[in-house]
Amino acid sequence: MVARRFVVRQGGGGGGGGEAEEHEVEYDTEHGLDILRLQIFSLTSVPPELQKIVVEADGSVVDDGTDLEAISEGLRLVAITGEEEEAEAAAAAEAARAQEKSDEELARMIQAEEEALLLQQYSIRNDGGEEFRERVEPYMHQVLMYEDPMRQEAARKTVPMDELQEKALVSLAKEGNFSPSKDEEDHAFLLQLLFWFKQSFRWVNAPPCDSCGRETFNVGMGTALPSEIKFGANRVEIYRCNYCSSTTRFPRYNDPYKLLETRKGRCGEWANCFTFYCRSFGYEARLILDFTDHVWTECFSNLYGRWMHLDPCEGVYDNPLLYEKGWNKKLDYVIAISKDGVRDVTKRYTRKWHEVLSRRIITSEDTVSAILSSITGKYRSGLSIDGLTALENRDKKESEELSKAAYLEVDTSISLPGRQSGSVEWRKASQKCSTYILSITSGNGCG
């Protein structure tokens, strides 16, 4: 932490005539560049997003990578002009176009997809899709619990709303947004809810001993007690203490109301409870089931006009390639589940669709679509015509988005992290498992 005094020159010497104005800024380098921009804004009325700060001594541009402790005190402020904004927008548009596959590469991908579909016919299991249905439909009961007004009120009472709202507004102000729209405020609050949840929920590899608080090891499964079954814990893991040999129970609760109390678990409990929180604050939210070994959340962003990925275990948002590119996961089925039905959203999370197709062997693609449509139709049957039309229009827009997503180029310059949640031992075990993540079905509970 270093206290600095900068002299910021504004105007003059730029061909526009007039004397340069000088402003002195007292600044603590610990606070970061965003705070410096806000201080300059208070003196010059140039919004942070339109500021270009240049070191007068060498002409270098001050950015997030600049060592603010080492530069000279003389700074020059240049307001970005409309022409520069247009140039930046044009460059961004060109970069977006460059992301799309070349015609030749796209043709290769489509051919590989057709070949994968052909081979899939010889690999799929001929059970009429019953296994697939059994892995998806039970989760509808799970997500419908999120709609209980009493549960939602209990959830809201556990959240420091005033604190998160303040943090949301501060985050917007740091971006130069001092008069945010409702959609912008809602979006910022959602991100603060994610960050808060990440800090307030506890990951469990092996629970501490109930008797002495020391480390335990798994010794198998136990029979659920009536008090545990009441809150959906059909599976109970049993652990023995390394020191006092006492046993500790770890019920895998499914009722999000109970998770408000326990505030612990693995990815199943984390995603279950966080999706419930999102619904409790009025966000359109879906539980996302990855058939390999993970669960997370999606919320519909009115700000972006699309569904947005959020992973409470990792504290990550809007980064759907995290699993394939960062974790090196071999995805097969990624299914979104909400009160309004179920959707296959696998294409959002892959840029290797033809490879994913080769692993989708539970049933045919037509059967997958038919089962999902059947489940969705069942849970939308009571909707009004207007409500149904709105959902169908949103589904259509999402289908178009997903169709394009699988053929977009991966930005190789972006490095995504591997999995952070869970111990190394647990992560290794998890990679060997492909069970149902929440304990509403049978399985050994890798998730």
Curated annotation (Swiss-Prot):
Entry keyword Zinc: yes
Coiled coil: none
Catalytic activity line of the entry: Hydrolysis of an N(4)-(acetyl-beta-D-glucosaminyl)asparagine residue in which the glucosamine residue may be further glycosylated, to yield a (substituted) N-acetyl-beta-D-glucosaminylamine and a peptide containing an aspartate residue
The keyword Zinc is annotated on this UniProt entry: yes
Main subcellular localisation: cytoplasm
Class of enzymatic activity (EC top level): hydrolase
GO biological process, one term: response to salicylic acid
SUPFAM superfamilies: Cysteine proteinases
Subcellular location: Cytoplasm
Signal peptide region: none
Enzyme Commission identifier(s): 3.5.1.52
Positions of the catalytic residues: C267, H294, D311
Cofactor note: Binds 1 zinc ion per subunit.
Keywords for the protein's UniProt record, in alphabetical order: Cytoplasm, Hydrolase, Metal-binding, Zinc
Record Gene3D superfamilies: 2.20.25.10, 3.10.620.30
GO MF assignments: metal ion binding; peptide-N4-(N-acetyl-beta-glucosaminyl)asparagine amidase activity
Residues bound to Zn(2+): C209, C212, C241, C244
GO cellular component terms attached to this protein's record: cytosol
Summary of the function given for this chain in its UniProt record: Specifically deglycosylates the denatured form of N-linked glycoproteins in the cytoplasm and assists their proteasome-mediated degradation. Cleaves the beta-aspartyl-glucosamine (GlcNAc) of the glycan and the amide side chain of Asn, converting Asn to Asp. Prefers proteins containing high-mannose over those bearing complex type oligosaccharides. Can recognize misfolded proteins in the endoplasmic reticulum that are exported to the cytosol to be destroyed and deglycosylate them, while it has no activity toward native proteins.
PANTHER family in the cross-refs: PEPTIDE N-GLYCANASE PNGASE -RELATED, PEPTIDE-N(4)-(N-ACETYL-BETA-GLUCOSAMINYL)ASPARAGINE AMIDASE
Membership in a protein family: Belongs to the transglutaminase-like superfamily. PNGase family.
Entry protein name: Peptide-N(4)-(N-acetyl-beta-glucosaminyl)asparagine amidase
Species in which this protein is naturally found: Oryza sativa subsp. japonica (Rice)
